[in-house]
Amino acid sequence: MAGLRLGPLLRHVDWESGTSATVWVETDRACTAEVRCPGGAGGSAPTFCVVGHHYALVVVTGLAPGSATTYEVLLDGERVWPLADSSQPPSTIRTPPVPASGAVVAFGSCRWAAPAVGESDPVGPDVLDTLSARLAADPEAERPDVLLFLGDQVYADETSADTRAWIARHRRAAGTGSAAPPDQVADYEEYTHLYDESWGDPELRWLLSTVPSCMIFDDHDVIDDWNTSAAWVADMRATPWWHERITSGLMSYWVYQHLGNLSPAELAEDTVYAAVLAAGDGTEVLRAFAERADADPATVRWSYRRDFGRTRLLMVDTRAARVLEEQHRTMLDAEEAAWLRTQAFDDPGGVDHLLVGTSLPWLLPPMVHFAEGWHAALCRGERGPRWARFGEWLRRRADLEHWAAFTSSFERLTETIAEVGRADAAPATVCVLSGDVHHAYVAEPVWTAGQQPRSRVFQFTCSPLHNSVPTAIRAGFRFGWSRLANSIGHLLARHGRVARPVIRWERSGGPWFGNQLMTLTLRGRTARLRLEMASAGAKQGRRGTDRTGARLIGVIDRSLTDGS
């Protein structure tokens, strides 16, 4: 009898017709996976195989718009979900009414796997586990229409003690991986263990089975500072274990994260997916694809678009699509940048809210922005070869690789946002959603006279979901918003011969530190922002608590538009 190894994950829900969804599962052997709903809705798919693991992405059809439909998962006709001993409510697929009146979008990034039940948690309660417990306690309460995961869903280079022990046993048994770091994953099998550890968490597993999700990678999904510079790439390609690491990282990302980002129509047109399904064993097909994606990133698009009624999400790849030639560095290659502009301007008048998902923040604390521009200038050779060598050394130690470090890309993104916001049929809001920096804040551009867009424009940064930041770094981020820090930043920019940014911006909220989640409630042309943080110490069993007694506390609840 086939067993359910991981999942189910509810991924894509159709907002155009409100009648279909996709559900992802991993099984322990080849079988037919079926999703069955009351009333006849459902779907089935045979599993496909990658490196001895079996997966299916089931397209569920026959759903009713504006409904909440429970479902179960069967493998070769035997029910495997809900789990026999589960105390969680049934998993449901919620479809929007058509036309949809709005969307509730929750987002964050950077999640270490939560420890097992009964173990202490050195970084505090997991905000997603805590959200899961609140929703399970009151299944009729408002829930997100979608969860956006903005990078570092797994940490391939910062593994837990349990995972390090498992890696050691795996490598001894397999006789492989001796050259790879003992505290980092080396191959596809080790990546599967990371996903088991992260998504097998009972609270998160139920949450992902009942709330749709969209995902994009950041560096730790592969390795810290992934694609930070051309010199870094050259050094890594000369490292004996790197080829298998990057190939396995991209293969596993495609299977565990990317496939579920696609609509059924996009899946039907995806040639790689078709080839994997057609092969008895899709390993070599997917390996060739991953090797090609690493060698020539322009051959693959990881970015994607989702429309939630009149809310548009553009999820942007800011890692694999970079141009790293030092004199012509860009965050996005020409084709990717053109795609972003095309999608942002498509169907003017048909979008009330434009969301740009980018793992790396667009607007940083001003001192950090100036420091990254200064540093990029040093690496280009503005102050000579000695400073350039220092710049490369610093780049690998200080994570100086956000939009600010790619000046032309920063300017082009700013221009795109401003043009969208100034259009006659501009959306009510343009919101850049980011993570990465292990704290949360809100920043708003300060436009010059006569350049004020019709749209309200925001940078919302929310991180981590479950991680930590050292005290010294907290102090640094707080200082980074100060006037003194701004003055220091200007001095650095002058040393690097860096021009002033094309806009100014100010912090209008934060910084906040903790395991946290931001939620946008978008109704018509109104918008509200809520930030909630997981707090320990509540009594066990209290409504809205998780297995450790944590609860979500409100940090801000703020209107972003008139009338909300």
Name these PLM-found stretches:
Residues 1-564:
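Metal-dependent phosphoester/phosphodiester hydrolase catalytic core
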